[in-house]
């Protein structure tokens, strides 16, 4: 009986704890974060151990949240008038002005023509595009339009964009011969 008790103590004392939280100043395996209560004068930091899986999950969650916020924000401007060179909801938007306005409102400052925006981020296959990614349209000589992906499934892709004919609107580009024939590529400027 004593040996069974000794074995139980030995097993439990050597088991790694999954909820270990360490604080310290010099641990190189720990992640450094500003304490939520810190100010410019108060430079205290908290340290806690994180696994790479936890970090990747947190980053993915934050990226997904930003993507959702961008799409929901863009949809709110549905019906806003088109204006060539327009960059605000009060005066109206052109396609690149609308895209720049939405992304800047969410902490990703971008501006410029569709051609300039196409040079940002990482190009992706059509099938890999996620909500919040940008899609570009035109012909072999020129990029003429940019839109924000609202949803992308195996069956259809919807975008939010500002068009000359209707201002800000949502379009299913999968069922549109016009948009399909002009589709060039997509770009991810959210993931880092």
Question: Can you say where each PLM-predicted feature lies in the sequence?
Answer:
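Structural motif
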Residues: 132-133, 148
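Short, Lys/Arg- and Gly-enriched loop/turn segments at beta-strand edges
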Residues: 142-149
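Aromatic- and glycine-rich peptidoglycan recognition patches
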Residues: 15-37, 150-192
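C-terminal motif of bacterial Sec signal peptides marking the signal peptidase cleavage site
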Residues: 10-13
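Catalytic cysteine-centered active-site loop
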Residues: 80-131
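Post-signal-peptide N-terminal segment of Sec-exported extracytoplasmic proteins
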Residues: 32-89
């Amino acid at each position: 009986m004593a040996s069974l008790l000794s074995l139980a103590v030995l097993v439990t004392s050597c088991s790694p704890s999954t909820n270990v939280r360490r604080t310290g100043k010099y641990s190189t395996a720990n992640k450094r974060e500003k304490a939520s209560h810190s100010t410019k004068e108060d430079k205290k930091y908290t340290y806690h151990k994180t696994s790479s899986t936890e970090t990747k999950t947190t980053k993915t969650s934050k990226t997904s949240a930003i993507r959702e916020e961008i799409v929901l924000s863009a949809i709110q401007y549905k019906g806003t008038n088109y204006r060539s060179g327009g960059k605000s909801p009060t005066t109206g938007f052109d396609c690149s002005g609308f895209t720049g306005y939405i992304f800047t409102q969410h902490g990703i400052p971008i501006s410029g023509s569709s051609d300039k925006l196409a040079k940002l981020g990482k190009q992706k296959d059509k099938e890999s595009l996620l909500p919040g990614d940008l899609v570009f349209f035109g012909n072999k000589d020129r990029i003429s339009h940019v839109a924000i992906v609202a949803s992308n499934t195996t069956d259809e892709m919807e975008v939010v964009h500002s068009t000359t004919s209707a201002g800000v609107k949502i379009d299913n580009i999968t069922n549109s011969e016009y948009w399909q024939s002009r589709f060039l590529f997509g770009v991810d400027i959210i993931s880092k």
